[in-house]
Amino acid sequence: MSEITLGRYLFERLKQVEVQTIFGLPGDFNLSLLDNIYEVPGMRWAGNANELNAAYAADGYARLKGMSCIITTFGVGELSALNGIAGSYAEHVGVLHVVGVPSVSSQAKQLLLHHTLGNGDFTVFHRMSSNISETTAMITDINTAPAEIDRCIRTTYVSQRPVYLGLPANLVDLTVPASLLDTPIDLSLKPNDPEAEEEVIENVLQLIKEAKNPVILADACCSRHDAKAETKKLIDLTQFPAFVTPMGKGSIDEKHPRFGGVYVGTLSSPAVKEAVESADLVLSVGALLSDFNTGSFSYSYKTKNIVEFHSDYTKIRSATFPGVQMKFALQKLLTKVADAAKGYKPVPVPSEPEHNEAVADSTPLKQEWVWTQVGEFLREGDVVITETGTSAFGINQTHFPNNTYGISQVLWGSIGFTTGATLGAAFAAEEIDPKKRVILFIGDGSLQLTVQEISTMIRWGLKPYLFVLNNDGYTIERLIHGETAQYNCIQNWQHLELLPTFGAKDYEAVRVSTTGEWNKLTTDEKFQDNTRIRLIEVMLPTMDAPSNLVKQAQLTAATNAKN
């Protein structure tokens, strides 16, 4: 095999970086490209219900596998995906967006083709995507196409941001040398500048030597930019108390003896708030300081000794060191930190949240009880996905087993995101370990935006747990504004009929309304193994919400009302 098509080259390269499932929809400008998927052993085409869901699925897949790929068609297809792509950009998720575009000659002649705006401008959609992409490429020359594909894949993986790649329909079946595949794409980070890195390390070590009450705070980009192992070792070597933010949940093992809880500014538990805010040194790893991640910007550190490790810079107090990447900086710090921290005397960390008190089995379910009890159901290795709304806030009260991966969209907050993300995560989990459980918590309102993707789960025999929190509408919106407003109401669905409606044959659908029903279901041994797709409708009062969401809603309403 001396020559292969450009389309096959793309998919062979994706397989080399462990992308095995491709998301998207067929369209006449990408059909020839899609033919090439089936030429690559081990590669599969998911085939989504719509492009928005496909983008959400690509996001969920990338969070577990490191990057993903979605394929859409020019204009109508690619624009339908952009909300999801924007979310991946905001949340630091590497998604390669491949768009099948009209032929080079059609573009040059400015033909009045379908899926265009009718003005001869074939670059307008590319320009739109450029604002939410780390880089873009529009292939026009077969000779440079392989190098451009390699550049786009590398950038997607290394930057953990979306990348746009336009492939004209007339080029995908042209051939390129197969020998190009023999040289792997370089996915390594560029080393830090040695002098800048050394200055950072020396300054951080000095702050550690002087600290009496330091803490470590892990945030979203600790996971996104692959610094979890370094952060864990930092905790082990120093024994500093360690905390996570809502977006960082799952980036530190919560059974670690030095794990102290979730810090959300003023929304934190009193013990966590005191422990973090009284620190005389904060080592922050991968911070993403958005409103819902910080309790509406209510961080209140008493110290100015704050070190921020980021994917592309490090900040020490008020001094910024551009280009000093956290992964390498942490690795260098780990070689010296034990000696610097030898004078530290460990202080107690806030204790693990207490278990629920025993109540009568007939007790109606409430949010506070459910989220504590969820921790009893989870086990090591689970992927836990929480929708924007009560789920994203309630999960902060759940104590994770070790090696649990949390997926949420706290910054972008597009409701309905998690249905597609669950599909993508389920594909990824199946490739990593078929026994790995994928567990979704989503509200009844959010589900109505993206429910079609459950049919894709069924078509592929995927087996996630779908916990649908039925609180009769948009509770998070009611808490912020319009408690009884008609616009926060939805049509109630017969949720237990969804799986058979979408064609499921081997499934379980059950409704739980009381603590006894919840406990009986979640402690059943057969239920605990992911042998089939399951939908669990959880009945909850309309205005019931986790306590931290009630507080956040008040803060958000106040912010919205400010002049």
UniProtKB/Swiss-Prot annotation:
It comes from the Eukaryota. Gene3D superfamilies: 3.40.50.970, TPP-binding domain. Mg(2+) binds at D444, N471, G473. Thiamine diphosphate binds at T390, G413, S414, I415, G445, S446, N471, D472, G473, Y474, T475, I476. GO terms for cellular component: cytosol; nucleus. One of its GO terms (biological process) is aromatic amino acid family catabolic process to alcohol via Ehrlich pathway. One of its GO terms (molecular function) is magnesium ion binding. InterPro entries: DHS-like_NAD/FAD-binding_dom, PDC/IPDC-like, THDP-binding, Thiamin_PyroP_enz_cen_dom, Thiamin_PyroP_enz_TPP-bd_dom, TPP-bd_CS, TPP_enzyme_TPP-bd, TPP_PDC_IPDC. Signal peptide: none annotated. Pyruvate binds at D28, H115, E477. Pfam families: TPP_enzyme_C, TPP_enzyme_M, TPP_enzyme_N. Its EC number is 4.1.1.1. Keywords: Decarboxylase, Lyase, Magnesium, Metal-binding, Thiamine pyrophosphate. Its cofactor is Mg(2+); thiamine diphosphate. It catalyses: a 2-oxocarboxylate + H(+) = an aldehyde + CO2; pyruvate + H(+) = acetaldehyde + CO2. The keyword rRNA processing does not apply. Binds 1 Mg(2+) per subunit. Binds 1 thiamine pyrophosphate per subunit. Belongs to the TPP enzyme family. PANTHER family: PYRUVATE DECARBOXYLASE (PTHR43452), PYRUVATE DECARBOXYLASE ISOZYME 1-RELATED (PTHR43452:SF30). Homotetramer. This is Pyruvate decarboxylase. The gene is PDC1.
